[in-house]
Curated annotation (Swiss-Prot):
Residues 118-435 are cytoplasmic. During host cell infection by tachyzoites, does not play a role in tethering the parasitophorous vacuole to the host mitochondria. Residues 55-64 have a biased composition (Basic and acidic residues). Keywords: Membrane, Signal, Tachyzoite, Transmembrane, Transmembrane helix. The keyword Repeat does not apply. This is Mitochondrial association factor 1 form b0. The chain crosses the membrane at residues 97-117. Residues 1-27 form the signal peptide. Residues 28-96 are vacuolar. It is a single-pass type I membrane protein. It comes from Toxoplasma gondii.
Amino acid sequence: MWRIWRCRLSFLFVTGCLLGALTAGLGSQMSDSVGRNVQAPAGVADASQEAGDVVEERTERTEEQVFAPGPPRRHSSESLFPRNPSVTARRRRNRRITLIATAVGVAVILAALYVLRRRRAQPPQEPEPPTRLRTPRPRAPSGQQQPSESEPPAGVPMKPGSLTLPFTCLGDTKVTFFGPSGRQHGFTPLYDPSPSKRVATVDAGANALFIGGGGLNGQFAKTLLEEAEKNGIRLTSVALSEHSQRIQQSLLRRAVKSPGKLVELDTGVASPVFARSFGFVPVVPGLMWKESKVGANVGVTFIHILKPEVTPYGNLNNNVMMYTVAPCGAPPDTTYSLAYKTTIAGVIRAAAAYNDTPAGQQYPVQGLRLPLLRGGIFRRNRSLESIGRANAEGTSLAITQYGPNFELQYMYDPSNAALHGLQEAESTYLASMLD
């Protein structure tokens, strides 16, 4: 989108420059034309002999005037060629046209520069849901399904190197920090091909509550669409975006009526993706902070049990996904810290509440795989260290209060902000125990 705007602004700028140059040249050309008309009035070129006689007569008259008594008379260009009033009016009109056209060209240039400056200063916006239908990819012959760009070939190890540490401040909960994988940019895969336990991966969702767009949210959409295609389910990115948005907005309306409680929605019949869905809000969105500062629907968490047709790798241990909305990095520190800690605590609290439901008893969550929420472009000028600290404080608060019995897995982050934040929280906790 920014490339399109940049092309439009460049075209507008060049057009303004050409307009200013052309109008200035046009005005100069018209002035020269008028000058030529003044220097050669009608009748002079066609009657050269008569002009000579007129000159002689005027010469004699001039001599008489010079030697005649009385005040001297002023000489002007009208003595030989009388000024034509219509020519003078045209000259003035052409000058006005030149000035106006030049002013318009300058105004266009200044407007283009102003819009370009405002566009560059504009903060990054939340990605919009996809609006174009994707052309279905040709399927490989049966038994020879080709690997997609989002998943490496079957022979490439999926699980990246990791570091697992117990944290006393988290009740000795084991936390795994993934290193870079063999995928593009070292990204951690959303799910493993053969997991030993059920791990629910948390999607860093959009404020508009749809699945799709860019970043991790787009990777979730791509994974679900590829699984649907493998199983012959006709599902487009637009349909997935609209359907997920409709389901999650419905869950949100139910959840805000019962803050702090997990609400349930049976989506099995009407949904091509979700067998069952849950919604949770720790507090009513916008009650403890201004949504104009942190963003809409911050703190909400959704849990979806995926249908077998869209479950990654067809493994039942991959059939649970979570979706949450974290704050952007623009608000003041106090507001941001409160919203972020509430969000991450809500994710852990919702997963613990889900395990107490009948569906959770059937498909219990034994681990959470999380990204560093809002650690990308939407953090604005906020440091990754401050996000890591807020994440650690919210996680410690939730585990201390609700004591969930599952491990935490953090996806690869080059800054290691989540690791450093938890290490700092651990040091603070151990120091307080010694006191």
